[in-house]
């Protein structure tokens, strides 16, 4: 299948060099005789340099990584036609971009190109780094970060231990176990020869990239260590380039608020199932959200619901136990302050109840998906269980019970047809439908 290009874009065959030109604010007209075009070599060189700035490659190694950069420059990742139709620059402050991805130029699939944080937040973070060293606003942020006491400890470390991440603001690292941190190192996809719990194969550059990512946004790390291919409800991590990551594409749950009743019931049923898997799974990790909104959940084109944004997801190790972030305030440094105030106080992991995910989703997401969708008796039952599920003052068992009853109500409201390709045609042979 060819990528989704409009007629004008198809005629121009806008690949990565052209995309970089207008992404960086240049305009180039193939039909204007008024001014001669630059030579192809000059144009590609300029495109490459400007593209480095757009992607954040000029900020490396204060970035995510470079594992997928070749795909961009070989034109195996192309922006969606919504941008390709314009030769002027697209908005460069969007949180994400739709694109098409190919391994052979013959078959293409939709992907999402996402920033770790907003462009404005990047500017603030970079400014804080320079200010921490009393340096000019345009300092070498990599040089400043390399001189920090935390990174010097990372350079000497053979293994990623809890003391090396203590004080970072991410919920993933609020009370990490050694088992969890070993999993981070073993599955970190931005280095060659992944698989060991020791960091002997990490270069200085690799360590800085991992530390920066953990400090700014752990979403790409979670996609790597809990991959969808193993049954985790997360999209596939395809790689990163500069300060962007590439993952499989999903549509935000918010776009389905107007869905027909059977589809709304199916999505709500799936979402409750996802929350159940976060609470109870074979690896004995308890995943919890610090906050939720509809954009954090997404739907693949086969109807399957996943967690689209894992940046607000924390992990507590029930098997090994987590090392509490005691003394975290004594470990705060510039890495602790890149995306939040240095004075931000994080709640203890011991205070996270099992009901937390359900209370958040039942109060802030499901009502908008399920409101006024069903006949009166059924709708009243749904609303009643949603109210119980959203009540944070109730004990854990009562909230969990309300969620279970809500699933029981939703189950027979789902239908079996090709719109739900993730479970069709198997559902035809299931007596629950």
Curated annotation (Swiss-Prot):
Protein location: Secreted
Pfam families: PIP49_C
Ranges that cross the membrane: none
Keyword presence, Protease: no
Residues the record marks as carrying a glycan: 100
UniProtKB keywords: Glycoprotein, Secreted, Signal
Recorded GO CC terms: extracellular region
Primary subcellular site in the record, as a coarse category: secreted
Signal peptide extent: 1-29
InterPro entries cross-referenced by the UniProt entry: DIPK2A/B, FAM69_kinase_dom
PANTHER family the record matches: DIVERGENT PROTEIN KINASE DOMAIN 2B (PTHR32073:SF8), GH11358P (PTHR32073)
Family label: Belongs to the DIPK family.
Protein name: Divergent protein kinase domain 2B
UniProt organism field: Bos taurus
């Amino acid at each position: 299948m060819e990528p989704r290009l409009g007629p004008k874009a198809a005629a121009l065959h806008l690949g990565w060099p052209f995309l970089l030109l207008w992404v960086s604010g240049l305009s180039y007209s193939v039909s204007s005789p008024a001014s001669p075009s630059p030579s192809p070599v000059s144009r590609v060189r300029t495109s490459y340099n400007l593209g480095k700035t757009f992607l954040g490659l000029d900020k490396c190694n204060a970035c995510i990584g470079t594992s997928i950069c070749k795909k961009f420059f070989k034109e195996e990742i192309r922006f969606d036609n919504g941008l390709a139709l314009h030769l002027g620059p697209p908005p460069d402050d969007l949180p994400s971009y739709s694109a098409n991805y190919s391994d052979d130029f013959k078959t293409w699939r939709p992907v999402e190109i996402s920033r770790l944080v907003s462009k404005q937040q990047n500017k603030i973070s970079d400014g804080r780094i320079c200010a921490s060293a009393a340096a000019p606003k345009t300092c070498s942020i990599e040089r400043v970060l390399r001189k920090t006491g935390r990174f010097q400890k990372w350079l000497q470390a053979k293994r990623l231990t809890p003391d090396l991440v203590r004080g970072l603001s991410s919920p993933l690292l609020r009370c990490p176990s050694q088992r969890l941190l070993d999993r981070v190192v073993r599955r970190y996809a931005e280095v060659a020869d992944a698989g060991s719990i020791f960091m002997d194969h990490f270069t200085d550059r690799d360590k800085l990239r991992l530390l920066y990512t953990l400090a700014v946004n752990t979403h790409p790390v979670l996609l790597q260590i809990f991959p969808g291919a193993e049954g985790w409800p997360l999209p596939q991590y395809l790689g990163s380039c500069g300060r962007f990551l590439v993952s499989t594409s999903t549509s935000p749950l918010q776009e389905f608020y107007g869905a027909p009743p059977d589809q709304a019931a199916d999505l709500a049923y799936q979402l409750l199932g996802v929350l159940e898997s976060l609470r109870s799974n074979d690896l004995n990790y308890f995943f919890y959200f610090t906050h939720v909104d509809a954009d954090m959940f997404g739907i693949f084109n086969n109807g399957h619901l996943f967690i689209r944004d894992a940046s607000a997801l924390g992990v507590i190790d029930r098997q090994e136990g987590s090392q509490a972030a005691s003394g975290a305030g004594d470990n705060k440094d510039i890495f602790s302050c890149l995306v939040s105030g240095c004075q931000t106080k994080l709640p203890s992991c011991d205070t996270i109840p099992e009901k937390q995910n359900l209370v958040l989703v039942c109060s802030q997401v499901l009502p908008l998906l399920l409101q006024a969708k069903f006949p009166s008796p059924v709708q009243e039952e749904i609303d009643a269980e949603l109210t119980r599920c959203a009540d944070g003052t109730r004990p854990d068992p009562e909230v969990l019970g309300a969620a279970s009853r809500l699933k029981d109500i939703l189950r027979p409201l789902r239908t079996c047809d090709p719109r739900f390709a993730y479970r069709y045609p198997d559902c035809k042979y299931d007596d629950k439908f």
